[in-house]
C-alpha cells in the first residue's frame, strides 16, 4: 500500500478584508485561524487553491 502525496499549508495572514473567493479557497483547504496548519492531498484542485492565496499562506512539501 502506498501513501498518498500530501503537502502542508499554513495560514500566515488574516482573511479579514480579502476577496470572497480567496476566503473560500482558504476555508476549502481547511484553514481557520492564523498559524493554523493543515496537511492536504497533493491534487491539482488543492494546489490551485493554495496557489490562488499564495500571499497569505506558507506551503511546505
UniProtKB/Swiss-Prot annotation:
GO terms for cellular component: cytosolic large ribosomal subunit. This is Large ribosomal subunit protein uL30. HAMAP family: Ribosomal_uL30_B. It comes from Francisella tularensis subsp. holarctica (strain LVS). PANTHER family: LARGE RIBOSOMAL SUBUNIT PROTEIN UL30M (PTHR15892:SF2), MITOCHONDRIAL RIBOSOMAL PROTEIN L30 (PTHR15892). One of its GO terms (molecular function) is structural constituent of ribosome. Pfam families: Ribosomal_L30. Part of the 50S ribosomal subunit. Belongs to the universal ribosomal protein uL30 family. The lineage of its organism: Bacteria, Pseudomonadati, Pseudomonadota, Gammaproteobacteria, Thiotrichales. Keywords: Ribonucleoprotein, Ribosomal protein. GO terms for biological process: translation. SUPFAM superfamilies: Ribosomal protein L30p/L7e.
